[in-house]
UniProtKB/Swiss-Prot annotation:
GO terms for molecular function: ion channel inhibitor activity; potassium channel regulator activity; toxin activity. Belongs to the neurotoxin 10 (Hwtx-1) family. The presence of a 'disulfide through disulfide knot' structurally defines this protein as a knottin. This is Mu/kappa-theraphotoxin-Ap1a. It comes from Avicularia purpurea (Ecuadorian purple pinktoe tarantula). It holds the Pfam family Toxin_12. The modification Phenylalanine amide is found at residue 36. Disulfide bonds join 3-18, 10-23, 17-30. The lineage of its organism: Eukaryota, Metazoa, Ecdysozoa, Arthropoda, Chelicerata. Keywords: Amidation, Disulfide bond, Ion channel impairing toxin, Knottin, Pharmaceutical, Potassium channel impairing toxin, Secreted, Toxin, Voltage-gated potassium channel impairing toxin. GO terms for cellular component: extracellular region. It is found in: Secreted.
Length: 36
């Protein structure tokens, strides 16, 4: 049920997996600062 910080998939909308991270809409996953 839990998701990994780097590999928690996300969408254009707020996602619990990206609580402390940034959802990279370019790649579709959660990253630390969006530069990935």
């Amino acid at each position: 049920g839990d998701c990994h910080k780097f590999w928690g998939w996300c969408r254009d909308e707020p996602d619990p997996c990206c609580e402390h991270l940034t959802c990279s809409t370019k790649h579709g996953w959660c990253v630390w600062d969006g530069s990935f």
